[in-house]
Amino acid sequence: MATRRPGKSYADAAVPGSTPGETPSELSSDTSPAVPMHVIYKLIGFTIAMITTPVGMYFVSVTFGASTTVAGIIAAVMANIILFLYIYVAWQEDKEEREADAARRKGAKAQ
């Protein structure tokens, strides 16, 4: 049979780094989102563009006299353009973050 350790309840053991005398207000709580909101907004925007642009271009092409095959090719090309734009925007954002980290490290070394 398991023995109970004195001074530590199950709730205390479940929270790493907590001691029996700590109150909940003393514990650090990180409620920040895992992903910044501007990243979520970009993802939502590109998702909407990825859905509406190819479908819209397909129907516009068919309406103006193109065959369905040509309209499908145009829709596929537009989907690829939006995908490459998303990759480029994400790459630029990552590049800016790396440059900011390098500047912070350089500033920390100078001090």
Swiss-Prot record:
Residues 20-32 have a biased composition (Polar residues). Keywords: Cytoplasmic vesicle, Endoplasmic reticulum, Membrane, Transmembrane, Transmembrane helix. Coiled coil: none annotated. The keyword Ribosomal protein does not apply. Residues 1-43, 91-111 are cytoplasmic. Residues 1-32 are annotated as: Disordered. It comes from the Eukaryota. The keyword DNA-binding does not apply. Pfam families: VMA21 (PF09446). Signal peptide: none annotated. It is a multi-pass membrane protein. GO terms for cellular component: endoplasmic reticulum membrane; endoplasmic reticulum-Golgi intermediate compartment membrane; ER to Golgi transport vesicle membrane. Required for the assembly of the V0 complex of the vacuolar ATPase (V-ATPase) in the endoplasmic reticulum. This is Vacuolar ATPase assembly integral membrane protein vma21. It comes from Emericella nidulans (strain FGSC A4 / ATCC 38163 / CBS 112.46 / NRRL 194 / M139) (Aspergillus nidulans).
